[in-house]
């Protein structure tokens, strides 16, 4: 695993964690009538699937995982068969950090047909 990939991955996780703290709702004025206020709410959309390539195995995974977790979504990552250890270590690090079971999963192959 390349140390630059690991350091970049840590920076990405930090950035999404900060962005996640700003996902509160807000009131905005209506375009047609300034007396009307509209509320913007940001809610999780549900489980997210991510398919990652072999190059930069940490960086490619954290870009997807960081965004999904910051938005409050659970995620299933289909890791690359060519570099299986990096995504597995990353998922384990999230588990060790206290991420609840079932929030982040990792698979490598789904039979012969990818679904």
Predicted regions and their residues:
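Hydrophobic packing residues in well-ordered alpha-helices of helical domains and bundles
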Residues: 5-9
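Rossmann-like NAD(P) dinucleotide-binding subdomain of oxidoreductase/dehydrogenase enzymes
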Residues: 12-15, 23-114
């Amino acid at each position: 695993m390349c140390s630059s990939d690991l350091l970049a991955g840590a920076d990405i996780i930090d950035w999404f964690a900060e962005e996640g703290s700003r996902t509160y709702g807000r009131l905005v004025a209506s375009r047609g009538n300034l007396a009307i206020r509209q509320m913007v709410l940001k809610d999780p959309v549900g489980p997210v699937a991510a398919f990652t390539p072999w190059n930069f195995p940490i960086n490619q995974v954290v870009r997807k995982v960081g965004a999904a977790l910051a938005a409050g979504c659970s995620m299933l990552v289909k890791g690359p068969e060519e570099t299986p250890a990096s995504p597995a270590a990353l998922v384990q690090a999230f588990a060790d950090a206290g991420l609840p079971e079932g929030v982040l999963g990792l698979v490598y192959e789904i039979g012969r047909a990818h679904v």
